[in-house]
């Protein structure tokens, strides 16, 4: 698997990813995307990420959408979810943006308890309504909760108590 913002993804990359059976995580924060995800010139990157998703769809690359749940995303989850559905994204992962454990300061973009609760309850209601109507969209967190509920093991390490080694290349090359 590989994680990307998709900005440099083109047909050549898509063919490579498909041929080598990569699962791609594409960072996309929907309608809130351009608030925090800027390019080197300070411009929002939402249009480019959507372009990357279309390229991957065209070439049959398997990909998931990874959304960072900021306070803005949480408060606008209905619009965010509808945007994801409209774009026919079928595999969604939501990653909560929490304050650092060693910092008492709250940042404007991090989630408070009330925002996160609203996000989870609202998203579950929207997802469940679609599920009951025969329109299944995979939301990793809910898929893992279901697995635990039926006595299976969650595949998400934060829910299973055991994580595999993951290699990361930071933005500065480390």
PLM region descriptions:
Residues 1-97, 108:
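Radical SAM/AdoMet-radical enzyme domain recognition
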Residues 96-99, 146:
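Residue-level detector of flexible, active-site-proximal loop/helix-junction positions
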Residues 103-174:
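A C-terminal junction/extension of Radical SAM enzymes
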């Amino acid at each position: 698997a590989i994680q990307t913002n998709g900005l440099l993804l083109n047909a050549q990359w898509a063919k490579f990813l498909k041929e080598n059976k990569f699962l791609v995580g594409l960072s996309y924060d929907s309608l809130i995307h351009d608030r925090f995800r800027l390019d080197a010139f300070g411009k929002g990157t939402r249009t480019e990420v959507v372009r990357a998703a279309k390229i991957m769809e065209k070439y049959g690359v398997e990909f998931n959408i990874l959304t960072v749940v900021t306070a803005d995303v949480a408060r606008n989850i209905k619009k965010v979810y509808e945007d994801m559905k409209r774009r026919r994204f079928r595999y969604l992962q939501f990653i909560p943006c929490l304050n650092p454990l060693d910092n008492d300061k709250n940042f404007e973009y991090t989630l408070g308890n009330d925002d996160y609760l609203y996000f989870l309850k609202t998203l579950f209601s929207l997802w469940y309504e679609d599920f009951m109507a025969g329109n299944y969209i995979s939301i990793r967190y809910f898929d893992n909760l279901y697995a635990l509920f039926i006595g299976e093991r969650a595949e998400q390490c934060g829910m299973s108590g055991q994580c595999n080694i993951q290699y990361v290349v930071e933005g500065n090359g480390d």
